[in-house]
Amino acid sequence: MAIPSRPIREEIRSIAPYNAGLTLEEVRAKYHVDEVAKLSSNENPLGPSPALRRLFPDIGELARLYPDPQGRALCARLAASFDVENNQVILGNGSEDLIAVICRSVVRAGDTVVTLYPSFPLHEDYTTLMGGKVDRVTVTPDLSVDMDALLAAIARKPRMLMFSNPMNPVGSWLTPLQLAKVVAALDPETLIVVDEAYAEYAAGDDYPSAAEVLKVTGLNWVVLRTFSKAYGLAGLRIGYGIVSDGSLCDFFNRARTPFNTNAIAQVSALAAFDDTYHLNRSVELALVERERMKKELATMGYRIAPSKCNFLFFDARTEATPVAEALLRRGVIVKPWKQPRFETYIRVSIGSPVENDHFIHALKEVEAVG
């Protein structure tokens, strides 16, 4: 199978990879020395303030030294899990950082990027920042993917196809058959980026792992994941991408900042990834509560999109912003959607049972007041 050319901007090709030097671990392993004086990166020998050490007693060298710019330990663990090479994994300051990196690497002025709509706004925003044109494929009236419109958009040979699966904010998803049709229709020069921020919640045989589907295609592709949702590390800002091959991943690495994921985030993500018990508990809670919340909202007469995420997207039957404001006054924070054509919709996260009860009670109060 012929390897398609890389859809990379010439400006990125001309940038040499950043040389961050060797880490302490690399020097010890390569040169077999125990004591190493790291005097290459202008770090403070005293380390962080004692106030920080009181907050985090074991922070030590994690805060004093620059992190591994490649996040090698975490990348190796992720690569093994996805059965890819280590150099096919890239880390980001949240997966949204990688959306920006990919757009900086690929999108030229005038290029077309196909997205699903409504979707995560940054898919469109970073395209626009690079001078690209967004080709929206709007969901059907039942809030599922419009496959005819999507395949028609793909047939126009865009520079990139970027979408979330499951979709944020709707919650619906492409099935294995639908994803296979998308892949079969793609031009070899089109980069496909599947944002799987909510994949851990997408239980069932009707949800495909994009990496497993794409690995055998020979296409240029990226699958994005995050530690912010099911792994509970939103405040640490760390996500990752699985890339079709090391060569393409190398170009993306040139477009990111060298130390875009901090050392604490890297070690925390590695620990979280290996704690499958906690992950399973988190997902199970979300799925059970999602179904309970869905029934409650349906009983109240609301129209709810199908969801494989840790949230529900429902039609408030009136402008959503005033409803959200009324909920705020009752101590509940939800997200009214403001993209055109969906201004009556609210996205509500699945919280703890107590939080979810608080929301339902508050929504009933808002309804009663009118």
UniProtKB/Swiss-Prot annotation:
InterPro entries in UniProt: Aminotrans_II_pyridoxalP_BS, Aminotransferase_I/II_large, HisP_aminotrans, HistidinolP_aminotransfase, PyrdxlP-dep_Trfase, PyrdxlP-dep_Trfase_major, PyrdxlP-dep_Trfase_small
EC number: 2.6.1.9
Reactions this protein catalyses: L-histidinol phosphate + 2-oxoglutarate = 3-(imidazol-4-yl)-2-oxopropyl phosphate + L-glutamate
Involved pathway(s): Amino-acid biosynthesis; L-histidine biosynthesis; L-histidine from 5-phospho-alpha-D-ribose 1-diphosphate: step 7/9
Cofactor(s) annotated in UniProt: pyridoxal 5'-phosphate
Pfam families per record: Aminotran_1_2
One BP annotation, GO: L-histidine biosynthetic process
Modified sites of kind N6-(pyridoxal phosphate)lysine: 229
UniProt GO molecular function: histidinol-phosphate transaminase activity; pyridoxal phosphate binding
Keywords from the named record: Amino-acid biosynthesis, Aminotransferase, Histidine biosynthesis, Plasmid, Pyridoxal phosphate, Transferase
EC class name: transferase
PANTHER family: HISTIDINOL-PHOSPHATE AMINOTRANSFERASE (PTHR43643:SF6), HISTIDINOL-PHOSPHATE AMINOTRANSFERASE 2 (PTHR43643)
Entry's family note: Belongs to the class-II pyridoxal-phosphate-dependent aminotransferase family. Histidinol-phosphate aminotransferase subfamily.
Subunit structure: Homodimer.
Protein name, per record: Histidinol-phosphate aminotransferase 3
Lineage, broadest ranks: Bacteria, Pseudomonadati, Pseudomonadota, Alphaproteobacteria, Hyphomicrobiales
Gene name of this polypeptide: hisC3
